[in-house]
UniProtKB/Swiss-Prot annotation:
GO terms for cellular component: cytoplasm. Residues 46-57 have a biased composition (Basic and acidic residues). This is Pumilio homolog 4. The lineage of its organism: Eukaryota, Viridiplantae, Streptophyta, Embryophyta, Tracheophyta. GO terms for biological process: regulation of translation. It comes from Arabidopsis thaliana (Mouse-ear cress).
Amino acid sequence: MVTNSYMDTRSNLTSVNRGSNVDLEDRFQRELESLLQQHRNQQSFGRERERDIDVHRSGSAPPTVEGLLRAMDNQYLNNNNSDHRDVGNISSITTSNGVELLSDDELRWHPEYLSYYYSNEHSNPRLPPPLLSREDWRVAQRFHNSESVFDPVGEWRKKTVEVDNSSSLFSVQPGVPVEQAENDLMELRNAVAQGRSQKVQRLDQGREDLIGLSGYSGLGPRRKSFADILQEGLERDAALGSQLSRPASCNTFRDMKDAAVLSNFSAGGFDSPLAFHDSLHSTAKNSPNTMLGSTMSSPVPRNRTPDSHLVGRSTASGLPPIGTRVGPVEKKNTFGTAIQNCESYTAADVADTLSRLNMSEMSQVKENHMQSQLQVELENQSDVMRYIPNGHKKALRQQNTAETKDHLFSANYGGMSGYGASLGASTVGSHGQVNIPKRTSSSASLYSTSDHSRLGSVGLSDVNIRNGNINGTDFSTAGGYMAKNKLNSLAEHYSAEGSHLTGDGDRQSLNRLINQVASELHSPVMDPHYSQYLHTASSTAAPIDHSLIRNNFGTSNGDTANEYLAMLLAQNRQQLGNLNAANSRFFESPSYDLGNMYLGNHLPSPSKNSRNFQNMRMSQSASMMKVPFGGLQGSSHVDIGSTAEASLLEGFKNNKTRSLELSEIVGHVIEFSMDQYGSRFIQQKLETATDEEKNAIFPEILPYGRTLMTDVFGNYVIQKFFEHGTTKQRKELAEQVTGHVLALSLQMYGCRVIQKALEVVELEQQARMVKELDGSVMKCVHDQNGNHVIQKCIERLPQDWIQFIISSFYGKVLALSTHPYGCRVIQRVLEHIDDIETQRIIMEEIMDSVCTLAQDQYGNYVIQHIIQHGKPHERSEIINKLAGQIVKMSQQKFASNVVEKCLTFGGPEERQVLVNEMLGYTDENEPLQAMMKDPFGNYVVQKVLETCDDQSLALILSRIKVHLNALKRYTYGKHIVARVEKLITTGERRIGLSSSLAANTTP
């Protein structure tokens, strides 16, 4: 191939480089031969890569995947120089003076051949068909544009085509050194060898990641969208992944703002990890947690998506790698993003620099940094939560649960990162799972050089287990089994054992112990402000002071013996006492919650099945906090005689035969009031309760009066107290309402309490309550809840006290009458306001728009109300305004109801006017026929047959009989036919009966 086309190629090169000597031409020849050899090497490497891929390829993969991979391998030939060529170059290469210069295989491998062949410009029918179908070629082109994953093959591919901006074997530019081609070939071999060794390592470790080959999925990588990244973040169950992550490629260093930082980093210019941390923090604004997670060359975290084509996809530019937790300070400029585009530093340089870092000092810096951030966030959250209504906290819980959980876990377990990083990939999940990988050649050296006392950073001394009540042991109360003494005695007993944990056997034993204990641990508790909203499937306990645990287990750099003892105690939880576990629902609504006390919130917080609140007695919480940490999840059995005391509400709901009295639920009134069954129990008891029983539970109700008023079940308890409570209790509850009438009136459940209060409280308190609505009357009228309060004010209060409400309706009667809620208010005004002047003003506005309101979906109710409940002259005036439009109104959906009301409540004369208009003035009775066939008019005709007198009935029946057969063919006419036949039968009987009676009375 080289010898056949060498002369022509050399002539082309000579034409480009006129004036070059023979030595230069010989050098070009050698370079061309080396490039062709490199091309053949790439072909063989591509075949080897395909064989590797076939091992992991699914048996159901489509047959075109192999061709697609081949096309993607060929994309390395496309470079920026493709912009300077066009498809016509193929023709010049293929045919020059009628002589074919390239073989069929060479043509097929040409980078422009596919686009030329599948375009409409080629005119040579003898061109060999390409190896790739048109569909596969299009897919390859599309995926080539989005391919941006670093791997040994991809990096070699880039460097192959970037030699002096050359993008094709057939467009070689002069000046390419032979040494560069040899270096590329050696780099390729090294990359392949390194990729194989990495794959063998991953297989030994039982991993499924395919490092180094981004196209294993068959479709190559695709750029993640924001939705993908967000979804993966929500699905992750740990703040730290099961593996430490690393940058997707060396290109992740490119965006570093200060090149001097990287130069010092690469050269080992930092004398201490503090200097290294400060420099990175000032440059990239990133915490050490993200820095370590981004720079350690641990495996890429496993992708959890079930889609096979997503296995090899990479993170988008500007986002940290998946598995790296981003803190608040890092969100806009993370270190993972800042180092994404560096080209000058290799992984070996980074690893060499990191190996010189003091990991214990770095972990301490990281812990201090994260704790300072958490302190600020906790203070901010504390301020916010004090002013958030109880109703809004439930939504806030859903927004902050995952984020707060991951962030706090990252901070609390931050001390483990030093040890975990030194081992390579030792991590701790948010569920307490400790993953320590198998010992490898790299970890062996770290074992031999690291200080084994750093094992303490993996233990519980550096973990905030405020709610992680170990094995149900109560660390915060004086009663029960005191684990402090037990831990101290065990610590003395095993203190000599710490020096024996340095051997390989003991390390393996410790690893096994850690993994066993990890299965027993649960996720650490979140910020106390949010802990009451987290309903996990596992049992939880009350918070524990972190300082108590630190005092027993030592500092963050505690010795190995204490950590070993902590894990030993967690594993052997049965030795700490014979404790019975309640089900998980019991802990979702404890009688007492230290988290709520710490919160300082005066409102009870909801749970799944019932409500809990914070003013329960300490004696009840002491026993509850002693339930084993592991718990018996899903069990409904509760041993009342044990140290765990069952909830009174749960016992009441589970035991239907048990009878309780109000005096027995003292201390649990709020919990009962906010439960469906408990609220119903209190309501029933209040109806027949004595004053003593009411006074026994009312002191618990009063402090949470406004909270219960807006609760779905608690509002009924407040209403019952307004209805059946003593005068003093009603007054005190009314004082709770003062200043909040408008807000409660606009609330779904609060509006019911306001209505009940307006019915029973004294007039003076009624006046004060209604006065708070001044200036917001129209807002309440247009509200689905507030309109009921306005109606109650109109019904219950004297007109002098609510004149500000009535006067706000003047000039707006038509608009209010056509409003879904305003029409109800206008009806109450017409019904309860007796003032003549007020009635006149309202009726004038209504009479001016009778026909409009009669046809409106809401206004027709106002007209019907006047016809049914209004004065006779008002009804006659409305019928007169409708006269002449009866047939039209009868065929309208809403106005037909008004016509029926006129026939029902109108006088005989008014009714006769309507009947005459329906019959018409001809013998054909066209209006009557049209009404009988109409979906709405037929009901008006039926109402006429029900309400008219005998004379009118006989006349109408005689007219209908003529059209009876025709009506049977119409859907709505059938109703008339059935009604007429029934009336005819009834009428004939009535006529016959009348005739017989007349004959008997004749002498």
